[in-house]
């Protein structure tokens, strides 16, 4: 949702293997109807879209970018397909990956959940636009546990973290119910031992 309508929109990026142009384009949707559309800009393909949450709390989805070569993070604050403002957040080493962009502290602004792929540490940035208002560590979790979603599972207005164990063979799923970067409570969901079943989305 990039235009303050209730309907979700579709962000396209031309980044395929054959002559990618880096074009970014948005369809503004009403059901199956594209009621308007527009090109945002062209961005070189070493930049990847890593999220599209509302970073500044204006009710419009923004675009979070990360550069594959050097770990630089950049945000577009959007008004429809127009970049209202933009700025660099910071640069983070490449062994850290963006694992979620939920609103973990319930302030109406999307945040960034990081995971260190070397040691399993999880860390959060609480954002105000492209500024880091505050940050904090969640904890360190063994690498056989993977972050698979960050929905608001208990309805308190704050995004939570869904974990899945993909290594031990039992397919355990576990939830952290978050209050900022603090784990307010946690618990097992169930086990899905058939690894042919994968979590593809959280709603």
Residue ranges of predicted features:
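Trp/Gly-enriched beta-strand/coil motifs that build multi-repeat beta-propeller-like domains
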Residues: 1-203
